[in-house]
């Protein structure tokens, strides 16, 4: 393959731009905000799970308190009715009077026990409510951090995308001046060789694989016409000759 020396030099410009695009793409993928958002999102998910559990406990305990208070009210109402019967003299026989007094005493103890249960449930409900409030605040805090990190990530991506668009446009302009067959070979080699399809020959060393060429290869390149497209015998990349090639 033949190409004018100037076209081969421009191929190095295309290569430089492709390297820059690779660097920008890597930087885009490696923004610290990506890992930060991922970590915060995991934290938020765990906290939301804890919050749901705490809210469930809160609602269950609230229902338990309502039931305990209803039990107290029922016992209190029954005791009030018995006391009213006692006060009204409705219990006329000694046995009825004794039974009524015994039931009033039993209900008073039952009411006391139930009121203790209500107090215990109220304490658990208060604790559950505090837990819900704490977790709600923590979820909001983490969500705020996620939003902040997302805003920073989006701003960084916007800046990088702008630079990528600019470099891509510049590559299009320069690559349009490179012969199609040379550019096709370059793109093929670039895909095969980790993003580097053309390299400068500097002081008899290929800048693609960093290997110094054998003297026989140097002699062949020295003897080749200026418009001959030469390849590195080590890595097979396109070698571009310049005044610094050491030929």
Regions found by a protein language model. Give the residues of each.
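Amphipathic alpha-helical coiled-coil segments
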Residues: 54-65, 107-125, 174-175
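Long amphipathic alpha-helical coiled-coil segments
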Residues: 67-79, 114-139
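Coiled-coil termination/hinge junctions
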Residues: 146-208
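Short, non-ligating residues that shape and space the ligands of small metal-coordination modules
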Residues: 215-216, 241-242
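Short linker/helix segments within small regulatory modules
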Residues: 221-229
């Amino acid at each position: 393959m033949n190409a004018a020396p100037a076209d081969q030099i421009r191929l190095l410009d295309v290569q430089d731009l492709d390297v820059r695009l690779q660097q920008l793409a890597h930087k885009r993928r490696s923004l610290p905000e990506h890992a930060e958002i991922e970590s915060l999102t995991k934290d938020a998910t765990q906290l939301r799970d804890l919050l749901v559990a705490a809210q469930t406990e809160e609602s269950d305990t609230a229902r338990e308190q309502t039931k305990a208070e209803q039990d107290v009210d029922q016992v209190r109402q029954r005791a009030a009715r018995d006391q009213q019967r006692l006060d009204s003299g409705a219990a006329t026989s000694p046995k009825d009077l004794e039974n009524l007094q015994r039931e009033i005493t039993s209900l008073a103890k039952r009411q006391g026990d139930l009121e203790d249960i209500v107090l215990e449930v109220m304490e658990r409900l208060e604790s559950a409510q505090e837990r819900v409030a704490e977790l709600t605040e923590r979820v909001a805090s983490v969500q705020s951090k996620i939003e902040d990190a997302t805003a920073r990530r989006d701003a960084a991506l916007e800046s990088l995308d702008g630079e990528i668009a600019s470099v891509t446009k510049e590559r299009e302009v320069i690559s349009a001046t490179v012969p199609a067959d040379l550019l096709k070979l370059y793109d093929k080699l670039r895909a095969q060789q980790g993003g580097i399809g053309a390299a400068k020959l500097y002081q008899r060393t290929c800048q693609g694989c960093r290997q110094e060429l054998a003297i026989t290869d140097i002699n062949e390149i020295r003897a080749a016409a200026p418009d001959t497209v030469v390849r590195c015998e080590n890595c097979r990349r396109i070698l571009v000759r310049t005044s610094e090639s050491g030929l």
